[in-house]
Amino acid sequence: MKKKFLSSNLLNRTVSKAVMMLLLITRPAFTVEAATNESIKLATPVLKVTGGKISGCSGEDSHVLIYKGIPYAAAPIGDLRWKRPQPVKAWQGTRHCNTFSAMAFQRERDMKSFYGKEFHDPQSEPQRSEDCLYLNVWTPRSAAGNTKAKLPVVMWIHGGAYMSGFGFEKEMDGEAWAKRGVILVTINYRLNVFGFLAHPALSAENKERLSGNYGLYDQIAALQWVVNNIAQFGGDPKNITVAGQSAGAGSVKNLVTSPLCKGLISKAIIQSGGGMGEFISTEANKDKLEALGMQMMDQLQRSEER
Protein backbone atom coordinates (compact mmCIF):
# COMPACT_ATOMS: atom_id res chain seq x y z
CA MET A 1 0.00 0.00 0.00
CA LYS A 2 1.34 3.44 -0.92
CA LYS A 3 2.49 5.47 2.08
CA LYS A 4 0.85 8.82 2.72
CA PHE A 5 2.83 11.79 3.89
CA LEU A 6 2.13 15.36 4.85
CA SER A 7 1.90 17.97 2.13
CA SER A 8 4.47 20.76 2.35
CA ASN A 9 1.73 23.23 3.42
CA LEU A 10 0.56 20.97 6.26
CA LEU A 11 4.22 20.38 7.12
CA ASN A 12 4.67 24.13 7.51
CA ARG A 13 1.56 24.55 9.66
CA THR A 14 2.53 21.65 11.93
CA VAL A 15 6.03 23.01 12.53
CA SER A 16 4.75 26.57 13.03
CA LYS A 17 2.58 25.37 15.90
CA ALA A 18 5.48 23.36 17.34
CA VAL A 19 7.70 26.44 17.21
CA MET A 20 5.14 28.51 19.10
CA MET A 21 4.93 25.81 21.79
CA LEU A 22 8.71 25.80 22.16
CA LEU A 23 8.78 29.58 22.45
CA LEU A 24 6.26 29.41 25.27
CA ILE A 25 8.14 26.79 27.29
CA THR A 26 11.70 28.08 26.92
CA ARG A 27 13.03 30.77 29.21
CA PRO A 28 12.95 34.41 28.06
CA ALA A 29 16.07 35.29 26.08
CA PHE A 30 18.39 38.09 27.01
CA THR A 31 18.25 41.16 24.82
CA VAL A 32 20.98 41.20 22.19
CA GLU A 33 23.80 43.66 22.71
CA ALA A 34 22.86 47.27 22.03
CA ALA A 35 25.21 49.88 20.68
CA THR A 36 26.69 52.14 23.35
CA ASN A 37 26.18 55.90 23.29
CA GLU A 38 29.88 56.36 22.55
CA SER A 39 29.77 54.07 19.53
CA ILE A 40 26.75 55.92 18.15
CA LYS A 41 28.41 59.32 18.57
CA LEU A 42 31.46 58.32 16.50
CA ALA A 43 30.63 58.69 12.84
CA THR A 44 30.78 55.51 10.77
CA PRO A 45 30.85 55.41 6.99
CA VAL A 46 27.53 54.63 5.33
CA LEU A 47 28.12 51.76 2.92
CA LYS A 48 26.06 50.56 -0.05
CA VAL A 49 25.52 46.80 0.02
CA THR A 50 23.05 44.38 -1.52
CA GLY A 51 19.63 45.59 -0.36
CA GLY A 52 20.50 49.18 0.52
CA LYS A 53 22.65 51.45 2.66
CA ILE A 54 24.00 50.52 6.11
CA SER A 55 25.80 52.21 8.98
CA GLY A 56 27.69 50.51 11.79
CA CYS A 57 29.20 51.30 15.18
CA SER A 58 32.59 51.54 16.84
CA GLY A 59 34.11 48.59 18.63
CA GLU A 60 35.63 48.82 22.09
CA ASP A 61 38.68 50.04 20.19
CA SER A 62 37.55 53.11 18.25
CA HIS A 63 39.90 52.13 15.41
CA VAL A 64 37.59 49.18 14.66
CA LEU A 65 34.13 49.40 13.10
CA ILE A 66 31.47 46.72 13.45
CA TYR A 67 28.50 46.31 11.14
CA LYS A 68 26.13 44.00 13.03
CA GLY A 69 23.11 42.08 11.82
CA ILE A 70 23.37 42.69 8.07
CA PRO A 71 20.75 40.62 6.20
CA TYR A 72 22.29 38.51 3.44
CA ALA A 73 19.07 36.74 2.36
CA ALA A 74 15.32 37.03 2.79
CA ALA A 75 13.84 35.76 6.06
CA PRO A 76 13.29 31.97 5.62
CA ILE A 77 9.78 31.99 7.08
CA GLY A 78 6.31 31.18 5.77
CA ASP A 79 6.50 30.10 2.14
CA LEU A 80 10.31 30.39 2.25
CA ARG A 81 10.72 27.84 5.04
CA TRP A 82 12.61 24.78 3.74
CA LYS A 83 13.56 26.61 0.57
CA ARG A 84 16.98 27.64 -0.61
CA PRO A 85 17.83 31.17 0.54
CA GLN A 86 16.24 33.89 -1.56
CA PRO A 87 17.58 37.39 -2.32
CA VAL A 88 17.39 39.88 0.51
CA LYS A 89 14.53 42.37 0.33
CA ALA A 90 15.65 45.95 -0.30
CA TRP A 91 15.05 48.61 2.36
CA GLN A 92 14.62 52.37 2.22
CA GLY A 93 17.00 54.84 3.83
CA THR A 94 19.98 53.76 5.93
CA ARG A 95 19.77 50.57 7.99
CA HIS A 96 21.52 51.04 11.34
CA CYS A 97 23.51 47.86 11.87
CA ASN A 98 24.50 48.42 15.48
CA THR A 99 22.88 45.40 17.17
CA PHE A 100 23.40 41.70 16.59
CA SER A 101 20.50 39.73 15.14
CA ALA A 102 18.63 36.82 16.66
CA MET A 103 20.27 33.42 16.35
CA ALA A 104 18.78 30.52 14.41
CA PHE A 105 15.97 28.74 16.22
CA GLN A 106 17.45 26.04 18.47
CA ARG A 107 17.02 24.38 21.83
CA GLU A 108 18.17 26.04 25.04
CA ARG A 109 21.80 25.12 25.72
CA ASP A 110 23.28 23.84 28.97
CA MET A 111 25.45 26.69 30.25
CA LYS A 112 27.16 24.31 32.72
CA SER A 113 28.48 22.09 29.93
CA PHE A 114 31.93 22.51 28.39
CA TYR A 115 30.44 24.00 25.24
CA GLY A 116 28.28 26.38 27.25
CA LYS A 117 31.18 27.58 29.39
CA GLU A 118 33.71 27.96 26.59
CA PHE A 119 31.61 29.35 23.77
CA HIS A 120 28.70 31.29 25.26
CA ASP A 121 28.13 34.24 27.54
CA PRO A 122 24.74 33.87 29.29
CA GLN A 123 24.55 37.64 29.71
CA SER A 124 24.53 38.20 25.95
CA GLU A 125 22.54 35.18 24.81
CA PRO A 126 20.55 36.34 21.77
CA GLN A 127 16.92 35.68 21.05
CA ARG A 128 15.94 32.72 18.89
CA SER A 129 14.14 33.20 15.60
CA GLU A 130 13.61 31.59 12.23
CA ASP A 131 14.42 35.03 10.82
CA CYS A 132 18.14 34.46 11.30
CA LEU A 133 20.01 34.94 8.00
CA TYR A 134 22.29 37.77 9.05
CA LEU A 135 26.03 38.34 9.18
CA ASN A 136 28.45 40.65 11.01
CA VAL A 137 31.56 42.45 9.75
CA TRP A 138 34.54 43.76 11.76
CA THR A 139 36.86 46.05 9.80
CA PRO A 140 39.52 48.69 10.51
CA ARG A 141 37.95 52.16 10.56
CA SER A 142 40.56 53.32 8.03
CA ALA A 143 39.46 50.65 5.53
CA ALA A 144 35.67 51.07 5.61
CA GLY A 145 34.46 52.61 2.38
CA ASN A 146 37.88 52.28 0.74
CA THR A 147 37.46 49.82 -2.12
CA LYS A 148 41.18 50.00 -2.88
CA ALA A 149 42.31 48.83 0.58
CA LYS A 150 42.21 45.14 -0.49
CA LEU A 151 42.53 43.69 3.02
CA PRO A 152 42.39 39.90 3.51
CA VAL A 153 39.00 38.53 4.58
CA VAL A 154 38.01 35.63 6.84
CA MET A 155 34.44 34.27 6.86
CA TRP A 156 33.83 32.31 10.07
CA ILE A 157 31.27 29.46 10.25
CA HIS A 158 30.32 28.53 13.82
CA GLY A 159 30.11 24.98 15.13
CA GLY A 160 27.47 23.28 17.24
CA ALA A 161 26.78 19.92 15.55
CA TYR A 162 24.50 21.70 13.05
CA MET A 163 22.03 22.04 15.93
CA SER A 164 23.14 25.12 17.87
CA GLY A 165 25.37 28.19 17.81
CA PHE A 166 25.41 31.67 16.31
CA GLY A 167 27.68 34.11 14.53
CA PHE A 168 28.97 36.23 17.39
CA GLU A 169 29.96 33.58 19.93
CA LYS A 170 32.58 34.84 22.35
CA GLU A 171 35.42 32.62 21.09
CA MET A 172 35.66 34.63 17.88
CA ASP A 173 37.09 38.10 18.63
CA GLY A 174 36.44 40.21 15.56
CA GLU A 175 38.23 43.24 16.97
CA ALA A 176 41.45 41.27 17.40
CA TRP A 177 41.34 40.35 13.71
CA ALA A 178 40.51 43.87 12.54
CA LYS A 179 43.29 45.45 14.62
CA ARG A 180 45.70 43.19 12.74
CA GLY A 181 44.40 44.27 9.36
CA VAL A 182 42.09 41.32 8.66
CA ILE A 183 38.36 41.77 8.02
CA LEU A 184 36.27 39.19 9.87
CA VAL A 185 32.78 38.15 8.78
CA THR A 186 30.68 35.85 10.97
CA ILE A 187 27.39 34.34 9.88
CA ASN A 188 24.21 32.69 11.10
CA TYR A 189 22.68 29.82 9.14
CA ARG A 190 19.63 27.62 9.63
CA LEU A 191 20.09 24.72 12.06
CA ASN A 192 18.56 21.41 13.03
CA VAL A 193 15.15 20.66 11.50
CA PHE A 194 14.94 24.12 9.90
CA GLY A 195 18.29 23.72 8.18
CA PHE A 196 18.54 20.04 7.38
CA LEU A 197 15.11 18.39 7.17
CA ALA A 198 14.62 15.89 4.36
CA HIS A 199 11.03 14.91 3.50
CA PRO A 200 9.33 13.50 0.37
CA ALA A 201 6.90 16.44 0.20
CA LEU A 202 9.83 18.86 0.14
CA SER A 203 11.83 16.80 -2.35
CA ALA A 204 8.87 16.81 -4.73
CA GLU A 205 8.98 20.61 -4.92
CA ASN A 206 12.31 21.04 -6.71
CA LYS A 207 13.77 19.79 -9.97
CA GLU A 208 16.55 17.80 -8.28
CA ARG A 209 13.93 15.91 -6.24
CA LEU A 210 16.06 16.47 -3.14
CA SER A 211 15.51 18.22 0.19
CA GLY A 212 17.66 19.13 3.17
CA ASN A 213 21.00 20.98 3.35
CA TYR A 214 19.24 24.35 3.55
CA GLY A 215 21.81 25.41 6.14
CA LEU A 216 24.63 24.72 3.69
CA TYR A 217 22.86 26.73 1.00
CA ASP A 218 22.65 29.56 3.56
CA GLN A 219 26.42 29.42 4.01
CA ILE A 220 26.94 29.57 0.25
CA ALA A 221 24.58 32.55 -0.01
CA ALA A 222 26.54 34.31 2.75
CA LEU A 223 29.81 33.59 0.94
CA GLN A 224 28.40 35.00 -2.29
CA TRP A 225 27.29 38.10 -0.36
CA VAL A 226 30.82 38.54 0.96
CA VAL A 227 32.29 38.25 -2.54
CA ASN A 228 29.82 40.83 -3.88
CA ASN A 229 30.04 43.35 -1.02
CA ILE A 230 33.25 43.03 0.99
CA ALA A 231 35.11 45.63 -1.10
CA GLN A 232 32.83 48.26 0.47
CA PHE A 233 34.36 47.38 3.84
CA GLY A 234 37.92 47.52 2.47
CA GLY A 235 38.21 43.80 1.77
CA ASP A 236 39.63 41.90 -1.18
CA PRO A 237 36.94 39.68 -2.76
CA LYS A 238 39.72 37.59 -4.31
CA ASN A 239 41.35 36.86 -0.94
CA ILE A 240 38.65 35.20 1.14
CA THR A 241 39.49 32.50 3.68
CA VAL A 242 36.58 30.36 4.87
CA ALA A 243 37.15 29.09 8.41
CA GLY A 244 35.16 27.02 10.87
CA GLN A 245 35.28 24.84 13.95
CA SER A 246 33.59 21.47 14.57
CA ALA A 247 30.40 21.48 12.45
CA GLY A 248 31.71 24.74 11.01
CA ALA A 249 34.86 22.90 9.96
CA GLY A 250 32.76 20.19 8.32
CA SER A 251 30.88 22.95 6.53
CA VAL A 252 34.13 24.45 5.25
CA LYS A 253 35.11 21.08 3.80
CA ASN A 254 31.73 20.86 2.09
CA LEU A 255 32.06 24.37 0.65
CA VAL A 256 35.56 23.94 -0.77
CA THR A 257 34.45 20.77 -2.57
CA SER A 258 31.14 22.17 -3.86
CA PRO A 259 30.95 23.33 -7.49
CA LEU A 260 28.61 26.09 -6.27
CA CYS A 261 31.62 27.71 -4.55
CA LYS A 262 34.01 27.46 -7.47
CA GLY A 263 36.11 30.62 -7.68
CA LEU A 264 34.74 32.08 -4.42
CA ILE A 265 37.24 30.72 -1.88
CA SER A 266 40.95 31.53 -1.74
CA LYS A 267 41.94 29.58 1.39
CA ALA A 268 40.38 27.38 4.07
CA ILE A 269 40.92 26.79 7.79
CA ILE A 270 39.39 23.57 9.16
CA GLN A 271 39.51 23.37 12.97
CA SER A 272 38.56 20.26 14.95
CA GLY A 273 36.28 18.65 12.43
CA GLY A 274 36.10 17.48 8.86
CA GLY A 275 33.76 16.13 6.26
CA MET A 276 33.59 12.68 7.81
CA GLY A 277 33.36 12.78 11.60
CA GLU A 278 31.59 10.46 14.03
CA PHE A 279 28.52 12.70 13.89
CA ILE A 280 28.35 12.25 10.09
CA SER A 281 26.69 8.97 9.15
CA THR A 282 28.41 7.09 6.33
CA GLU A 283 25.11 5.30 5.69
CA ALA A 284 23.03 8.42 5.15
CA ASN A 285 21.17 8.54 1.86
CA LYS A 286 18.08 10.18 0.43
CA ASP A 287 15.65 7.39 1.34
CA LYS A 288 16.86 7.03 4.93
CA LEU A 289 16.90 10.76 5.57
CA GLU A 290 13.42 11.22 4.11
CA ALA A 291 12.15 8.33 6.24
CA LEU A 292 13.62 10.01 9.31
CA GLY A 293 11.94 13.27 8.33
CA MET A 294 8.59 11.52 7.91
CA GLN A 295 8.96 9.88 11.31
CA MET A 296 9.64 13.21 12.98
CA MET A 297 6.69 14.95 11.30
CA ASP A 298 4.37 12.07 12.18
CA GLN A 299 5.38 12.42 15.83
CA LEU A 300 4.75 16.17 15.72
CA GLN A 301 1.34 15.65 14.17
CA ARG A 302 0.35 13.04 16.76
CA SER A 303 1.46 15.27 19.65
CA GLU A 304 -0.62 18.10 18.16
CA GLU A 305 -3.72 15.88 18.04
CA ARG A 306 -3.50 14.93 21.73
How would you label these PLM feature ranges?
Residues 2, 32-213, 237:
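Non-catalytic accessory segments of hydrolases
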Residues 2-18:
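Bacterial N-terminal signal peptides that target proteins for export
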Residues 17-28:
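Bacterial N-terminal signal peptides
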Residues 93-123, 204, 208-212, 217, ...:
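Mature extracellular catalytic domain of secreted serine hydrolases
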Residues 226:
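A glycine-rich beta-to-alpha transition motif near the start of alpha/beta enzyme domains, typified by
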Residues 233-245:
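Alpha/beta-hydrolase fold nucleophile elbow
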